[in-house]
Swiss-Prot record:
Cystine crosslinks: 51-96, 160-198, 178-188
Name of this chain's protein: Ribonuclease Oy
Residue positions with a glycan: 52, 121, 142
Swiss-Prot/TrEMBL keywords: Disulfide bond, Endonuclease, Glycoprotein, Hydrolase, Nuclease, Secreted
Gene3D superfamilies: Ribonuclease T2-like (3.90.730.10)
GO biological process: RNA catabolic process
InterPro entries found in the cross-reference section: Ribonuclease_T2_eukaryotic (IPR033697), RNase_T2-like (IPR001568), RNase_T2-like_sf (IPR036430), RNase_T2_His_AS_1 (IPR018188), RNase_T2_His_AS_2 (IPR033130)
EC number: 3.1.27.-
Location in or out of the cell: Secreted
């Protein structure tokens, strides 16, 4: 399957946990975490997946990155194997990116994710625009989309999730940016941008990761 750009998705730990009963956010995780770096196609409904079943994830190949991966690409589900999130992302998406020199193996692929997280840090982008985690303040999707565009110059895809257990509120869940195969920023697909899962007419919430912050 052909693909022509990357989607780089970062997620807010509190909202990830609103979706999953067994969830734990380690003290070392204080901001937006990486969800994944996904080869994507603007002609297909989504990009290629599971491109090489004979290349399983091997933690030994990313050992130098593990301390950073735990902090910035964390698995928040204690009922799963420690490396299962990275295994899943590699098998489903990473194996589809190996044709590019910059992401041709596990070390390069996960290293690129960490590089992009440092360069396009969502916590920093939102803080620069006055959007801060808060127990009480709500934010509107239009303002948030415009804020991200002011920072990056391109349209991002912003997603929310409904927290039916605790707060009964819409929570900011994920922000995805799109990049060329040369890792230059581009606007994401207009259809995906407009079909946000965040409510258009009411605010969503962005609660802090650790209560003491």
């Amino acid at each position: 399957k052909d693909w022509n750009y990357f989607t780089f998705a970062q997620q807010w730990p509190i909202a990830v946990c609103a979706e999953h009963k067994s969830c734990f956010i380690p003290d070392s995780v204080v901001g937006w975490g990486i969800h994944g770096l996904w080869p994507s196609s603007d002609t297909e409904s989504k990009g290629p997946e599971n491109c090489n079943g004979s290349w399983p994830f091997d933690i030994n190949n990313v050992m130098p990155l593990v301390p950073e991966l735990k902090k910035y690409w964390p698995n928040l589900y204690p009922d799963t194997k420690a490396n299962s999130f990275w295994e899943h992302e590699w098998s489903k998406h990473g194996t589809c990116a190996t044709s590019l020199p910059a992401t041709s193996n596990e070390l390069k692929y996960f290293g690129m994710g960490l590089k992009l997280h440092a360069k396009y840090n969502i916590s920093r982008i939102l803080v620069n625009q006055g959007i801060l985690p808060s127990k009480t303040a709500g934010y509107m999707i239009n303002e948030t989309e415009a804020a991200v565009k002011r920072e990056l110059g391109v349209d991002a895809v912003i997603e929310c999730v409904y927290d039916k257990e605790k707060t009964k509120k819409q929570l900011l869940y994920e922000i995805s940016i799109c990049l060329t195969k040369e890792f230059e920023l581009i606007s994401c697909n207009k259809k995906e941008v407009s079909e946000t899962t965040c409510p258009r007419k009411e605010p969503f919430f962005y609660p802090p990761v650790h209560d003491n912050n």
